[in-house]
Amino acid sequence: MIQGDHEDAPGQLELNWTYDDVLRNADRLSTYRQICAQVAREFNLIACFMTKPFMGVSASGCHTNMSLWSGGKDKLNKLGHKSLPAMDEVFTYVEGGKNTFMPDTKDIQLPGKVGLKAIGGVMKHLGALTAIGSSTVNSYRRLWDQGFWAPVYADWGYQNRTCGLRVSAPGRFEYRSVDSMHNPYLMGSGLLKCFDDGISNNIDPGKPESRSMYEAQAAGKEVKKLPLSLGQALDRLAEDEVIKSAMPDEMYKVFHWYKNDEWERFLGATTQWDLDTYLDCLP
């Protein structure tokens, strides 16, 4: 972990990890969640990873900044200590190598050819990826409560927080359609499948959108929205063989059964909203 700050919502914290191998950082995020939850319990508190516990304030996302490297070697960083309080692997990071997403033209913003193809792959599969990155019923409160920078549109651009993907700096981009309840192993696997599909099949991502998506839509652009419910996202995933292949053998079946059951149990429940809206309603 290299940085943390108080985010917009009351009691909300943002934490950032050093760039590293996708599997290693998935391990770190999972370990942090467990430690955070345990420390909170010891202080009689709840470490809440729920995506949208309150409407009208920022939700909890988990944006993933990505680049694709060749080469590089693992290096142990003891941080100036003679001995370490955990396994060496915890303090090991990839160092060196070549970032294949770096610009390769005079346009210092535009990702290189490999990066553009990778973006194309993500754009193609964004609907199905949403089922992994926004994997709970509550996740979609984040997308419906507009005005808090949650991505609703399947597009990409530079520093454009209304898109599902933005180029956040030369040589890397930020996948935004992912929240605090996601599984980082499945998310990483899904994104790598998108990269592979985009690069192998030369998928063109189209032109980056410089306007906010709301402005673009008002100007007449035909925009594509992300799935706006868990049910819609699961349908998109069921149709996408590339993303399903990120969950091999029985894994996709288990994921589908578990998440479809969650969606159907929600549909079968009477909520407080139902009572507030219809209890004293005269048809």
Q: Would you name each region that the model predicts?
A:
Residues 1-30:
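Active-site acidic/histidine clusters and adjacent loop/turn architecture
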Residues 4-7, 134-138, 248-252:
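Short coil/turn segments at secondary-structure boundaries
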Residues 10-11, 56-57, 254:
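Short secondary-structure capping/turn micro-motifs that flank functional sites
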Residues 18-22, 170, 242:
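A broad detector of the eukaryotic-type serine/threonine protein kinase catalytic domain
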Residues 23-210, 215-223:
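Active-site capping/gating regions of soluble enzymes
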Residues 211-283:
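Acidic, glycine-enriched catalytic cores built around paired aspartates
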